[in-house]
Swiss-Prot record:
Subunit field text: Part of the 30S ribosomal subunit.
Family: Belongs to the chloroplast-specific ribosomal protein cS23 family.
Listed HAMAP family: Ribosomal_plastid_cS23 (MF_00619)
Protein keywords: Ribonucleoprotein, Ribosomal protein
PANTHER family (alphabetical): 30S RIBOSOMAL PROTEIN 3, CHLOROPLASTIC, OS04G0461100 PROTEIN
Molecular function per GO: structural constituent of ribosome
One Gene Ontology cellular component: ribosome
Name of the protein described by the UniProt record: Probable small ribosomal subunit protein cS23
Superkingdom as given in the UniProt entry: Bacteria
One GO process term, biological-process aspect: translation
Matching Pfam families: PSRP-3_Ycf65
Keyword Secreted: no
């Protein structure tokens, strides 16, 4: 049931991830019709504190509910932790399989 709640909450948004050798970058897009519209710029980890910057950017958008912000930040945390702990040593295709609801591009 929790998975259904997550999908319902995130259905207005999607995460975009740049999967790089020395960094991972996360941005949020809003889903509009059958397309997407950029909502934030990319925030890079570990170059900057991507999670804190993303949190601050989402908090500026008062029309995003607290539940949606929490779900987006939780998902960003999962991606950053995966990249940090094991993912940076694996190709982007493996990350895409693990996080199938996220849009990935990368060179690593």
């Amino acid at each position: 049931m929790k998975i259904s709640f997550r999908r319902l909450e995130l259905s207005r948004f999607t995460l975009r991830v740049l999967w790089l050798e020395k960094d991972v970058a996360i941005a949020v897009d809003q889903i509009v019709g059958k397309g997407t519209s950029p909502l934030t710029s990319y925030f890079f980890w570990p170059r900057t504190d991507a999670w804190e910057l993303l949190k601050a950017e989402l908090e500026k958008k008062s029309w995003i509910t607290e539940a949606e912000r929490i779900e987006l930040l939780n998902r960003a945390t999962e991606i950053i932790n995966y990249w940090q702990e094991e993912g940076k040593n694996h190709p982007v295709s493996e990350a895409q399989k693990r996080f199938s609801d996220v849009s990935f591009v990368g060179t690593a």
